[in-house]
């Protein structure tokens, strides 16, 4: 596995976010809407969002009264979130950080009620990266906190297409995607209790996610 190639993905995303600031649109994702139901049901008002992208879910959560610490490794993306949070008068509810989540998170222990990430886990992250990230999430969550994430799965039409980049990662059109099996999801439960795994579609292709 070429780690240098995986590291170059940050430049590819930076280029795309800077040239296509509306590439994901402004409507919240299905997963954000489902997560909000969980947050409201459990009186969650303080979350960390990893891989916030262009902030469509960040803004949605803040508009519903939830404080969001939004992290992304693209400087263009975090600048766009800052701009949008100001335009929507949500500065008090959104903290934006430009950071690589493969490093130890800049957060205190037991600081958040929940962690949310939409398709971050299926980026160019090795199995070890994912295990390390999972332990960091566990560290920054309060006891009984929720870790809600989505990833493209083995039922996705693009699985095993393109160039194999090691483990369950394949590259197409310059993007490396890590595809998840149910066993992989369960392997990341160390320290967590599985509440549910839901399969769903996103987009017109559609992408198959869990």
Spans of model-derived segments:
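Conserved helix-to-beta-strand junction in the class I
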Residues: 136-143
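A short beta-strand submotif of the Rossmann-like class I SAM-dependent methyltransferase core
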Residues: 117-120
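A short, conserved alpha-helix within the catalytic core of class I
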Residues: 124-136
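Active-site micro-motifs of SAM-dependent methyltransferase domains
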Residues: 103, 122-123
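A short acidic, Gly/Pro-enriched loop at the edge of an enzyme's catalytic core
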Residues: 105-115
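Short conserved AdoMet
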Residues: 125, 142, 190
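Short glycine-rich, flexible loops that bind phosphorylated cofactors or substrates
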Residues: 123-124, 156
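Class I (Rossmann-like) S-adenosyl-L-methionine-dependent methyltransferase catalytic domain
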Residues: 1-42, 47-104, 132, 146-210
């Amino acid at each position: 596995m070429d780690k240098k190639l995986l590291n170059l993905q940050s430049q590819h995303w930076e280029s795309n976010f800077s040239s296509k600031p509306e590439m994901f649109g402004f409507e919240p994702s299905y997963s954000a809407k489902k997560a909000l139901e969980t947050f409201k049901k459990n009186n969650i008002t303080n979350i960390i969002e990893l891989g916030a992208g262009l902030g469509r879910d960040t803004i949605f959560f803040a508009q519903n009264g939830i404080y969001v610490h939004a992290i992304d490794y693209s400087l263009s993306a975090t600048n766009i979130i800052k701009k949008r949070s100001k335009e929507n008068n949500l500065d008090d509810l959104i903290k934006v950080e430009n950071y690589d989540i493969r490093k130890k998170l800049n957060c205190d222990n037991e600081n958040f009620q929940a962690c949310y990430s939409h398709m971050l886990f299926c980026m160019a992250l090795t199995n070890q990266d994912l295990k390390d990230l999972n332990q960091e999430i566990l560290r920054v969550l309060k006891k009984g906190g929720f870790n809600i994430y989505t990833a493209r799965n083995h039922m996705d039409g693009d699985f095993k297409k393109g160039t194999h980049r090691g483990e369950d990662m394949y590259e197409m059109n310059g993007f490396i995607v890590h595809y998840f099996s149910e066993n992989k999801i369960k392997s990341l439960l160390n320290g967590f209790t599985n509440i549910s795994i839901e399969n769903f579609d996103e987009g017109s292709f559609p992408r198959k996610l869990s």
